[in-house]
A protein has these predicted regions:
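Non-globular, low-confidence helical/coil segments that flank catalytic cores
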Residues: 2-3, 7, 16-277
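Activation on beta-sandwich/Ig-like modules and their edge loops
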Residues: 272-373
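Repetitive helical segments and hydrophobic/amphipathic motifs
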Residues: 11-12
Length: 373
């Protein structure tokens, strides 16, 4: 495994695995234009948002690199797919989660259709002023202060993590209106680490926020190929003028920040990707909702931790420990497929959209597309 770290502030020799005593770590996983933020210290290991469904392999790998096998909590800042899409992966992979937290403000669906409830879990709704505690670590809920009926981004949970080593401000996709309300509230936004709102887009992170935070490290999670113009040059300039070093996940496995006794240091996370051995082709029969995986090579292929993803419906199916023999096929059906016509059941209906163009992709365990149809 290769990891590259370019630390800004040295605080001694740091172990590259595990969590050293007396520090907090933040990993902004490189999930494209989305958020999946792992935070770990002696008190807890939590996940803030889950990225898009198709990036599940990238989240899986980051959790493995961090040694995370269970989560004390998942905080879902808001319901947009680039933050909530990976919930299905967490559920299907069987990763233990002690508690689920969410913003009570959203308008896209009724509460019974909230993404956390869609995976069979019950969220605890966090109002501004609430605090979630793990030992000496607190997650203070600063926003939303009111419900937006026009922009889900402005319904984002905004959290301040406060621990013995310092403060991290976690802002979801907060845009200008929520940002202004937060500034007007008089909340103390000073922090060592800022997770920059809304992927560094130009609709957030004004000078007021940059100066109020005055963070040592500002982290932007985005991919300009998915969201051109991010990070916005003006956003980066305002952060730098406020004294922040800006780190962007694009092109890397992620960004790691370590916080120790008020000093923050950042570096890029990069690791050698495992090879996917085999030549697997995907074919889809949309009418019967059957997806056929065919091994066209001359060696058996393991499908462990591979997954299928339907783009239009944002649906994900994690394959099991199936081995696909050379020249063999595996047929995946859904609850809409005729009984007895498939080998493995994707336990959902209407996975493939018949209302708009859909693409189903087979992804390998690292989150790389293998075959699409």
């Amino acid at each position: 495994m290769k990891k590259v770290f370019c630390f800004l502030l040295a605080f001694g020799a740091l172990l590259m695995t595990g969590c050293a005593r007396g520090e907090a770590r933040l990993w902004a996983v490189g999930v494209g234009k989305g958020d999946a933020i792992l935070i770990q210290n002696e008190d807890c290991t939590v996940l803030i948002d889950t990225g898009k469904g198709y990036a599940a392999g990238k989240l899986r790998r980051a959790m493995a690199e961090m040694g995370v096998e269970k989560l004390d909590a998942v905080f879902l800042t808001h319901v947009d797919n680039d933050h909530a899409g990976g919930l299905t992966y967490l559920a299907q992979a069987g990763i233990p989660v002690d508690a689920w937290y969410a913003s009570p403000c959203f308008f896209k669906f009724k509460k019974k259709k909230h993404p956390i409830r869609q995976i069979g879990q019950e969220p605890q709704w966090l109002e501004a002023g609430a605090t979630v505690r793990f030992g000496e670590t607190e997650f203070q809920v600063l926003a939303p202060l009111s419900k937006s009926e026009t922009e889900e981004n402005d319904n984002s949970l905004v959290l301040m993590m406060v621990c013995p080593d310092g403060r991290m401000l976690l802002t979801g996709d907060m845009e200008g209106p929520e940002e202004e309300a937060l500034l007007q509230s008089g909340a103390d936004l000073a922090c060592q680490v800022l997770k920059v709102p809304n992927h560094g887009d130009d609709d957030a992170t004004g000078a007021g926020l940059a100066n109020a935070a005055e963070a040592q490290i500002a982290v932007i999670s985005t991919d300009s190929s998915e969201k051109p113009g991010t990070p916005d040059a003006g956003v980066v300039a305002r952060l730098e003028q406020a004294g922040s070093q800006v780190w962007v996940t694009e092109g890397h496995g992620g960004v790691e920040v370590r916080l120790n006794q008020g000093a923050a240091a950042a570096g890029y996370l990069d690791w050698a990707l495992s090879e996917f051995y085999g030549d697997v082709r995907l074919a889809v029969d949309a009418e019967t909702e059957r997806m056929t995986l065919e091994n066209t090579g001359d060696k058996d292929v393991s499908l462990k931790d591979c997954y299928l993803y339907s783009e239009a419906g944002n649906e994900l199916f994690l394959l099991g420990d199936e081995a696909l023999p050379a020249g063999g096929q595996l047929v995946v059906g859904t609850k809409s497929s005729p009984e007895g016509t498939y080998d493995v059941l994707w336990n959902e209906k209407n996975v493939i959209s018949n209302k708009k163009q859909d693409t189903v992709t087979l992804y390998d365990p690292e989150g790389r597309g293998v075959s699409a149809y």
